[in-house]
Swiss-Prot record:
Top-rank EC class of the record's enzyme: transferase
Annotated function: Catalyzes the transfer of a phosphate group to glutamate to form L-glutamate 5-phosphate.
Catalytic activity field: L-glutamate + ATP = L-glutamyl 5-phosphate + ADP
NCBIfam families, per database record: proB (TIGR01027)
Listed name of the protein: Glutamate 5-kinase
Residues the entry annotates as binding substrate: S60, D147, N159
Residue numbers binding ATP: K20, T179, D180, T221, G222, G223, M224, L225, T226, K227
Subcellular location: Cytoplasm
Keyword list, A-Z: Amino-acid biosynthesis, ATP-binding, Cytoplasm, Kinase, Nucleotide-binding, Proline biosynthesis, Transferase
Length: 378
């Protein structure tokens, strides 16, 4: 990590971008949409379009707009009330963006996604194809989580995560996360005035996760840690991430012109195939298996499949075909993938050689608990 910037922003060379705009940047401090702010973002994205760049906008603001329309001053905690606010507010959010982009001769499209949409392989591919078609048509997709139908168990959790997943979905060159903070600091600048600003780092650097923490404003849901984890996700498709203040004048167009603004997190992690990204990011974890040191080494350094003999413990309940995390003896995740046996059967065959599976279970569907083609090292 360094406080020095590179000479030119990575955004200048990016042809396909995902820009995530937080609630605080499109609302009047949570009291409904700020139409001037919406117009401002539309103008900047229109300028990027004129440069030949394709842009997908991930925008928060539906719940805040719904709260304003319903006369609620405090964000509700009950899921059904949040969903009601989202249903009311999404109408206003789409209308505002449609009107704003129309001033520049651009059409918009509403894309509402849930985790289940991306967890299902066919729906994942359909969403991908639809977004590519919209971009080819010169349409600006406005993406948000479908808050009206999601539950706590299937939520993305925040639009930073959604932005990263969309970045991977469309193979974008870069992700821009706009927030109400300048970028990343080595400590919370609101508590430590001497905190050093981080202008440049590598996405996936473990030190970043250790530094980050705390929630953002009371309007949205994402703190700085979620942004760092989003950058790590995006890096696995080769996309760079910039975390910058949306309060900076014309921040998007200036980044596109090569100006270095905010924190730039470069993608240096191994680029995963589309299938590996889907396995790692879009499927819900159903449990964990604790591995001994030998099994961890085999997965990380030898590219081997996971065998029952290397499993020390099973945590949680899962079925064959679910996504399960592989963790070491200290609880650190090293891989995840599709499991070939249920949690009940895995408990019966752990610490056993594969040659004993048929004797213990009565039959053997696979010699591996997790085949190397169906797992990804994390």
């Amino acid at each position: 990590m360094t406080a020095q910037t590179s000479a030119v922003s990575v955004i200048s060379a990016a042809n396909r971008l995902v820009a995530k705009v937080g609630s605080s940047l499109v609302t009047n401090e949570g009291r409904g949409l700020d139409r001037a702010a919406v117009d401002h973002w539309a103008a900047q994205i229109a300028a990027l379009h004129q440069q030949g760049k394709q842009v997908v906008l991930v925008s928060s603001g539906a719940i805040a707009e719904g709260m304003a329309r319903l006369g609620w001053r405090k964000r509700p905690s009950a899921m059904h009330e949040l969903q009601a606010a989202a249903a009311v507010g999404q109408m206003g959010l789409c209308q505002a963006y449609e009107a704003a982009f129309a001033e520049f001769g651009l059409r918009t499209a509403q894309i509402l996604l849930t985790h289940e949409d991306l967890a299902d392989r066919h729906r994942y591919l359909n969403a991908r194809s639809t977004l590519f078609a919209l971009l080819r048509l010169g349409v600006v997709p406005i993406v948000n989580e479908n808050d009206t139908v999601v539950t706590d168990e299937i939520r993305f959790g925040d639009n930073d995560t959604l932005g990263a997943l969309v970045t991977n979905l469309i193979e974008a060159d870069a992700l821009i996360i706009l927030t109400d903070q300048r970028g990343l600091y080595e400590a919370d600048p609101r508590c430590d005035p001497a905190a050093r600003f981080v202008a440049h780092a590598q996405a996936g650097d473990a030190a970043l996760e250790a530094m980050a923490g705390g929630a953002g404003s009371g309007v949205g849901t994402g703190g700085m840690l979620t942004k760092i984890l989003a950058a790590k996700r995006a890096a696995h498709s080769g996309a760079h991430t910039v975390i910058a203040s949306g309060r900076e004048r014309n921040v998007l167009t200036r980044l596109a012109q090569g100006e270095c603004i905010g924190t730039e997190l470069r993608a240096v992690l191994p680029v995963w195939s589309a299938r590996k990204q889907w396995l790692a990011d879009h499927l819900r974890l159903r449990g964990r298996v604790v591995l001994d040191d030998g099994a961890v080494h085999a997965l990380l350094h030898e590219g081997k499949s996971l065998l029952p003999i290397g499993v020390a413990e099973v945590q949680g309940e899962f079925e064959r075909g679910d996504v399960v995390a592989c963790v070491d003896m200290h609880g650190r995740e090293c891989a995840r993938g599709l499991i070939n046996y249920s949690s009940a059967d895995t408990r019966r065959i752990l610490r056993q050689p594969s040659s004993q599976i048929a004797r213990i279970l009565g039959s053997m569907t696979d010699p591996e608990l997790m085949h190397r083609d169906n797992l990804v090292v994390t």
